[in-house]
Amino acid sequence: MTFLQLCQRLRAECQDIGVGPASVLSSAPRDQIYIQAIREAWLEIQLLRPDWTFWPDDLSYTLTAPQSLAVDTDVPFIPEQYHVAIVYFALGQRALSASSTELVEKHNQLWSRYYSMLTDRYTGSVIVGVSPMPTSNNDQYSVGEILAQ
């Protein structure tokens, strides 16, 4: 989805009357609400975790230089199946601004689903309870013994 399509999708998810924005360069106040929400959501998602592995190989965007959406045809660099995650993240901001409990609930349910998919795919594996045991003269020490030394 393009930046413009993401903005239009957010407006539809918010069940706002009408269509639009027609362009992300629109200066209409109502359009700017959706444009800014999508722009900020994508920046926040990129900066949400320092261990994301979705950054492009060419290093065109990084944690210290994230992608900013600016024109209608800009496309977030993550695979298209995850683009709607940006919409659902932005929906949370809009839901709070509109004081809509229905939209807050929709945001909570859908963003948590997409966040789980993103973290499953774009963060490293977590291994719990496995650590190498240091040896000394071929003797193994327990963690408690190591801490006592």
Report residues per predicted region:
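Short, hydrophobic/amphipathic alpha-helical patches that form generic packing surfaces
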Residues: 43, 84-97
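Small-residue hotspots
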Residues: 88, 92, 104-107, 111-114
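Inter-helical turn/loop segments and adjacent helix faces that build the functional surface
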Residues: 17-24, 95-103
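Generic alpha-helical propensity signal that fires on short helical segments
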Residues: 19, 100, 108-112, 129
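Conserved short "hinge" loops at termini or chain/domain junctions
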Residues: 1-78, 120-130, 135-149
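Surface-exposed, low-hydrophobicity beta-strand/loop segments enriched in small/polar/acidic residues
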Residues: 85, 116-120
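Short, solvent-exposed positions on alpha-helices
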Residues: 32, 102-105
